[in-house]
Amino acid sequence: MMQLTPDLLISAYAQGIFPMADEFGAINFYDPNPRAIFPLDSFYVPRRLARTVRSGRFTIRVDSAFRAVMLACAEPGPGRASTWISDSIVAAYEELHEQGFAHSVEAWREGVLVGGLYGVALRGLFAGESMFSRERDASKVALVHLVERLRAGGYVLLDTQFLGSDHFRQFGVVEIPRSEYKRRLAAALRVDASFS
């Protein structure tokens, strides 16, 4: 079985590919066409969600519970008995996190982790990997905070890989051809962005 290492993962993201485990735990790499991205300059926050963000209902933390976020994202959900986030993927991304390339944005309420997301930051690219929510809007609020952080840090590309669920559409997610994604990725890798 393929051994995921931080160097292998960084090389993969720099080429526009990413890993997922199949139902047997085997790691496969993907390079979808088309590719889904959130345009950072036109990311749209619906009015109701903007009120929730402003309300302070959730406390947002960054990188305080990276492993817990990954494990929550890996939990089975409605219509999904298993997930592509295997034990080996968790271990590899924890190493990336320790090296400063993988980050989590977490929504907490009354001291309990109720939502969040994680992904990989490489130069001007942030590749969103997965998100979870145990309370309404928790992961969406984390996403809004992620976008604010990426804009402030000089990022130029927020990759969401696949179109995913319909709720992404409300934020302005778009699909672009693989060739256009690779062009934008090359430009993003020339950008000196900062997540902190």
Regions found by a protein language model. Give the residues of each.
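N-acyltransferase acceptor-side catalytic subdomain
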Residues: 1-196
